[in-house]
Amino acid sequence: MKTNMILSLSLLLALLAWSQEPAAQVRKVQVGDKPGVWLEVAGPTRRVLIEAEVVKREGELEEFLCRSRTKEHESILKADIDARDAHKALLLAGAESGAPVQFAPVYKPASGSKVKVSVRLTGEDGKVSEIPGKSWVRNRKTGKELDSDWVFAGSKILDDMNMPGRKVYLANDGDVICLSNFDTAMLDIPVASSKDNANLDFQAWTERIPKLGTKVVVVLEVSRK
C-alpha cells in the first residue's frame, strides 16, 4: 500500500509538470500493473487510452466495451484489463464519478462527469484516425446514430463474499462502457435504455465497424463543458 501511494504521488507530480509543457509534447504513462490502460498527456489535456479488440459487428448490444471473457456476445469491443485501472485513469484525467443508474423506487439515470468516447484506428497505410464511438451504434427504433455521450457512473465496490477482506469492483464482471443501463456500470448513458433482451435499444452499425479481431484504442476524454 505504501509503495502504491508513493507511485501515485510520483505520477501526480509528473502530471503537474507535464501539464505545463506545450500540447505538441505528448506523453503516455501506463496505469496499473499490466499494459492495456494508459493516460495520455498533451499539455493540459489528459485522455485515457484503452487497448481493445473488435468482437461483434452485428446484432443487438448491451455494451460498447466489456472486459475480456465476460460479455463479448453483446459488446462491440473487449479489453483485457482490470476495470479498476480505467477508473483510476479517469480520475487522473480529471473526471468525477457520480452514481450508477437507480431503478427503484423511481428511475434515476446514471450521473457523473460527461465522457466523450472515441476509437483510434490505424489503417493499412499506417495512418491513424479517430472516430466517435457512438458512430458504431444505431438506435433500433429510430435507425439513427446514438445521440448521447457517456457519464462516469463509477460502478460499485463490494466485499468479496468468498474472500474476506477482499474488495470487488463490479464493472469487472463486464459492464465497462455500457449501452444498456446497469447499476454496475463504470460508464453508462444517462438515458433510459433497457437491458431486457427482447427490448434492447441499440444495435451494431455493421457497415461502420472494422472486421472482427481488429485492434483499436478506445479514447476517453472528460468533457469540460
Language-model region placement:
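Bacterial N-terminal signal peptides
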Residues: 8-16
